[in-house]
Amino acid sequence: MENLNSYFDLFDQSRTSEQAFEELVGLFSDDIVFVLNGHEKQGIENWKLFVKMVFKENADIKHMFEGWKAVEGTDKFETPWAVCGKRASGSVFTQTGKDIAKLDENGKISYLENVPGDTNMFDTYKN
């Protein structure tokens, strides 16, 4: 659970800190499965590409989350989140949604699903 609790802060810090980026990557298993608005990707290298894409498209971002809770009857955890940011174009945005995660036997994040309120949020990362 410690890795889940560190995730959002490290994600935001990773935009300007290579050390935070390495710590962020260390939260995940090498074979991470992540789902962005219904589009599944696999592997830590694809995860790193996604994070870099977010930072290329956004000049600044800040996440808030309510707290990870176990999903009854499953091995998953979830939390509602909100993010505000400034795109590279200069426009500002807000977004809400939820993340669903699983941890492996070592406590690393092995599955992460991002379910944004805006279904177009990750259109640029479908391919």
Task: Please annotate each region the language model reported.
Residues M1-L27:
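Short acidic-aromatic low-complexity motifs
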